Amino acid sequence: FMHVGLEQLGFNALLQLMIGVPLEMVHGVLRISLLYLAGVLAGSLTVSITDMRAPVVGGSGGVYALCSAHLANVVMNWAGMRCPYKLLRMVLALVCMSSEVGRAVWLRFSPPLPASGPQPSFMAHLAGAVVGVSMGLTILRSYEERLRDQCGWWVVLLAYGTFL
């Protein structure tokens, strides 16, 4: 249970509640749990490969998987959603994600304070976003699912397993 600071802890908790809970209500606990854990795993593996000296703290990979899966869900079910604020929801999610990634990049490359240790990496955020979009388009339910979408699900799942 480590985070960079109260800002990251609060931001991650807020996004998990605002985005994760509605996604769970629509798509079920199992799918969203798998999505979140895949984002955390991909974020951790990406940091261990690309930025080996940076510590991995927090659940940003999972949070970004949830956020980008939410964006994929809105795009995938655009016509079937009855919410009049679809575009506003997407813009707000993108602004929140961009501001947190910008903060993480700033913390990583700014000179550390004398009392602080190495700054955490931002690569977990990016890996979580990639996992969220790719898995969100495949494992989340489409309101108008077609056979070609089911075939695409198996192809992306196989590719995802291969890359892990």
Curated annotation (Swiss-Prot):
Q: Which domain of life is it from?
A: Eukaryota
Q: Pfam families from the xrefs? A: Rhomboid
This protein's species is Rattus norvegicus (Rat)
Q: Which UniProt keywords apply?
A: Hydrolase, Membrane, Protease, Serine protease, Transmembrane, Transmembrane helix
Catalyses which reaction?
Answer: Cleaves type-1 transmembrane domains using a catalytic dyad composed of serine and histidine that are contributed by different transmembrane domains
Per the UniProt record, which EC number(s) apply here?
3.4.21.105
The protein's matches in SUPFAM superfamilies, at most eight in alphabetical order, are given as: Rhomboid-like
Q: What is this protein called?
A: Rhomboid-related protein 1
Q: What role does it play? A: May be involved in regulated intramembrane proteolysis and the subsequent release of functional polypeptides from their membrane anchors.
**Topology of this chain in the membrane:** Multi-pass membrane protein
Please state the protein's primary subcellular location.
membrane
Give GO cellular component annotations, separated by semicolons. membrane
User: In Gene Ontology terms, what is a biological process of this protein?
Assistant: proteolysis
Where does this protein reside within or beyond the cell? Membrane
**Where in the sequence is the active site?**
60 (nucleophile), 125
Q: Which gene encodes it?
A: Rhbdl1
Catalytic EC class:
hydrolase
